Regions:
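Conserved "HGTGT" condensation-loop signature of ketosynthase/thiolase-family condensing enzymes
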Residues: 1-133, 145, 153-157, 168-344
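Short catalytic-loop micro-motif centered on adjacent basic/acidic residues
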Residues: 134-138
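Short-chain dehydrogenase/reductase
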Residues: 148
Length: 344
């Protein structure tokens, strides 16, 4: 029998501050350009000696992870699984600049060592004393969902009982400029940001449980015409139909190519309430982790914060109970992912 998987704790460092009960009541839409995270006092959760050696992304990740474990009343973890689009890109920039400035000679290895994509997961293992399964996924816009799928499969199969799942990406000046010049990001259209979101997943339900993570699906390429079949097949796997979805968590950005997919999904599920999260999180490779946190919050509280509505003036009648929520993410017409949550 497949085990159920619950989100027992959430932690985050975002442009809206840290994860907290009032995060959505205090949230404001980000402005165009670069939106760095609202950094907390890291010493509240991370020892000072360890903190001094951490880069921005590692600090955000470790803080969010500790926060998620505290929320779940969990002190130890069996496994750590993370996703990141660009890894510790600040240190990557630093190392490449040193190569250029020193004509590829007399380089110290520190920045290179700290720039690897699995640095956050490795630092968490040291911080938490976890000697178990440790994996980092780097798959562009589906990096977090790839990590999520790994965690879900292992928990459902009974290979693990508890997993620390997370995602982190940071803003690096040089990398940001490269992405802008390549047309990958358009800060004049939508804010480019950073953040870390972590989740304590377990097969045991607790009082702190926010929602049940039911299923995850990934597909590299789709047309808007293929989207309906992609979604219906995904739901059918769980014995569900499109009419069973109470809400959609979407990633509108103002980019015509991206938004066409989200608009198409709204047409496929016209009865589901359309919600959005990117005006609060900003755009970065693993921002969908914030969308998952927002979706879990809704199912836990049985209330949709006004700031999450796609169109507050056209919101639909509230269901008797928010039961199923579907999170859909893609970027540039590629890396399409679906995450299904159920109230617990």
């Amino acid at each position: 029998m497949t085990a159920k998987v619950y989100i027992n704790g959430i932690g985050a460092v975002t442009a809206q501050g840290i994860w907290r009960p009032e995060i959505f009541s205090e949230a404001k839409a980000l402005q165009q350009g670069i939106s760095p995270a609202d950094y907390p006092n890291y010493r509240d959760l991370i020892p000072g000696a360890a903190l001094r050696r951490m880069s921005t992304g590692v600090k955000m990740g470790c803080y969010a992870a500790k926060q998620a474990l505290l929320a779940a009343d969990q002190e130890t973890v069996e496994a750590i699984i993370t996703g990141t689009g660009l890894g510790c890109s600040i240190d990557s920039d630093k190392f490449l600049q040193q190569i250029w400035a020193n004509d590829e000679q007399y380089l110290t290895p520190t920045a290179f060592i700290q720039s690897t994509h699995n640095t956050v997961a490795a630092q968490l293992a040291l911080l938490l004393g976890c000697k178990g399964y440790n994996m980092t996924y780097v798959n562009g816009a589906s990096s977090f969902e790839s990590a999520c799928l790994d965690a879900l499969l292992q928990l459902q199969a009974g290979e693990l009982g508890q997993v620390l799942l997370g995602a982190v990406d940071e803003i690096a000046t040089q990398t940001y400029e490269f992405l802008r010049l390549a047309g990958r990001i358009k800060p004049d259209v939508f804010p480019y940001a950073e953040g870390a979101c972590f989740f304590s997943l377990a097969t045991q339900r607790k009082a702190s449980s926010c929602a049940e993570l039911v299923d995850v699906e990934l597909c590299n390429q789709l047309t808007t015409a293929d989207l309906g079949l992609f979604v219906s097949n995904f739901l059918a796997r769980q014995g569900l139909q499109t009419e069973d979805m109470d809400a959609l968590m979407l990633g509108y950005t103002g980019n015509v190519q991206d938004d066409a997919y989200y608009a198409a999904l709204e047409e496929i599920l016209p009865h589901a309430q359309a919600l959005q999260y990117k005006p609060l999180s900003g755009q970065y490779d693993t921002c969908s982790a914030f969308g998952l946190a927002a979706a879990a919050y809704i199912l836990k509280q049985q209330e949709v914060p006004p700031v999450l509505y796609r169109d507050l003036q056209q919101r639909q009648s509230r269901p008797d109970r928010w039961k199923y929520l579907l999170l859909y993410h893609q970027y540039g017409g590629k890396d399409h992912t679906l995450l299904l949550l159920r109230v617990c």
